[in-house]
């Protein structure tokens, strides 16, 4: 169901130290820095820790993202359109492959 989950942090170095240890105990490789984010990739999805893109401090929900997996780009576009039609609001780029 999920392709990725991202949570916010105000201290990326401290978060990386914590998640390297915690996820390492599950056999996950150490996180990889990419700008203001740290990514933990596995065969089944991605967990990431990020400073919020809006520049505000991380708090409950700010800096957090969950990506729903879609079987095709057309389904991802349909999902996005349905969400907007139901009153949702786009907060970042439209659906598509994210580099990083």
PLM regions with names:
Residues 1-3:
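Extreme N-terminal starter segment of soluble prokaryotic enzymes
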Residues 5-7, 66-67:
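Short, contiguous strand/loop micro-motifs
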Residues 7-47:
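Core segments of cupin and vicinal oxygen chelate
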Residues 10-14, 68-100:
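Vicinal oxygen chelate
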Residues 25-27, 54-55, 95-97:
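Intrinsically disordered, low-complexity segments enriched in polar/charged residues with Gly/Pro
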Residues 36-38, 51, 93:
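Extracytoplasmic/periplasmic beta-strand context in beta-sandwich domains
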